[in-house]
Amino acid sequence: MRIVADENIPLLDAFFAGFGEIRRLPGRSIDRAAVADADVLLVRSVTPVTREMLEGSPVRFVGTCTIGTDHLDLAYFQDAAIQWSSAPGCNARGVVDYVLGSLLTLAEIEGVDLRQRTYGVVGAGQVGGRLIAVLKALGWKVLVCDPPRQSAEGGDFVSLDEILQRCDVISLHTPLDKSGQSPTWHLLDEARLRQLRQGAWLINASRGAVVDNRALHDVMLEREDLQAVLDVWEGEPQVNVALADLCVIGTPHIAGYSLDGRQRGTAQIYQALCTFLDQPAAISLADLLPTPWLAQVSLDAATDPQWALNMLCRGVYDPRRDDADFRRSLTGDTASQRLAFDALRKHYPPRREIEGLKVHLEGESDTLTQLIRALGAVRV
């Protein structure tokens, strides 16, 4: 079996060497010629997989080690009887850690109490749903907008306009869809961006084009009260540098780049390929993940809960380092910036997740116990 794979997919050999020959390529370089003799194609979101790429090739399985599928021509896959799989939820915890770290940074800069803010989550899928659960477990007020789920389930959802009018913090977690009943391309266009309430914080860790980047730049120039955290950008790997300069935090599409999440995505595609080939999965991710450098922390029952929240979250992941690295990359000409964007992702340092962190609590505190549980950590 011949496998063509994005060279940045982790644990390629560990999971796929047993299937046959692996040819590694930069994700943006995978094209029709690269898959001309491939049976299996393994990609990330940077590789558009289209009819033009695959037609006439022997490829019968496509796996993307990401949660999104907007880079896959699923209609063609169905017509051509090509089996495919994504990795839903693989990086959800990493994105939640990113959002929490960003919120704590913003709160520190603005001098506000996160418990007093109203949060609007747009998109309640794998990532958004996880964030909603954590925010509610912390006891914070959350409004949710998800038109597809509202149509299918009913329930306690609100409109996007209500989110814009009522929420101090808006976090976007939608797929990118240019058509259908609920398109998300430029979901936040200039008109909607101008509806943001006074002092609002906008976080986008979904897809760059969910927000009209040019319009956001223009609105932020006019409204100094707004704050933005952007991990995704229209036109990646090119970035609107003028917009990045206006953001409190800017990063190169790494919100979900935890070591756990990236390797989890590879494991999910491995399991899907095993199912496609009708053979048992012989490799477990649990056997491959290294021990985290911060495996356990200790708290006293008298610890201030807000200090504990800050320590647990930013002790595991603090987005300010990624922001600093990103800003240093926004120099030189356009070509240099594009190369630097991809290099930051390719050489991203290992980062673990809060989930599973062991916390020893000396004494009893219902508030701290609830906090530990809300973050997905484990009291020991």
Swiss-Prot record:
| Gene3D superfamilies registered for this protein in UniProt | 3.30.1370.170, NAD(P)-binding Rossmann-like Domain (3.40.50.720)
Among the Pfam families in the record, one is 2-Hacid_dh
- Where are the active-site residues found? 207, 236, 253 (proton donor)
- Per UniProt, substrate binds at 45, 66, 257
Catalytic activity entry: 4-phospho-D-erythronate + NAD(+) = (R)-3-hydroxy-2-oxo-4-phosphooxybutanoate + NADH + H(+)
Which GO terms fall under molecular function for this chain's record?
4-phosphoerythronate dehydrogenase activity; NAD binding; protein dimerization activity
UniProt superkingdom: Bacteria
This protein's GO CC annotations? cytoplasm
UniProt keyword list: Cytoplasm, NAD, Oxidoreductase, Pyridoxine biosynthesis
Its EC top class is oxidoreductase
E.C. number: 1.1.1.290
Q: What is its main location?
A: cytoplasm
Q: Is Oxidoreductase found in the keyword set?
A: yes
Q: Where in the cell is it found?
A: Cytoplasm
Q: List the pathway annotation.
A: Cofactor biosynthesis; pyridoxine 5'-phosphate biosynthesis; pyridoxine 5'-phosphate from D-erythrose 4-phosphate: step 2/5
Give an example GO biological process: pyridoxine biosynthetic process
User: What positions does the entry give for NAD(+) binding?
Assistant: 126-127, 146, 174, 205-207, 231, 256
What does the similarity note say? Belongs to the D-isomer specific 2-hydroxyacid dehydrogenase family. PdxB subfamily.
Q: What does this protein do?
A: Catalyzes the oxidation of erythronate-4-phosphate to 3-hydroxy-2-oxo-4-phosphonooxybutanoate.
The annotated subunit structure for this chain is: Homodimer.
- The protein here is known as Erythronate-4-phosphate dehydrogenase
Its lineage reads: Bacteria, Pseudomonadati, Pseudomonadota, Gammaproteobacteria, Pseudomonadales
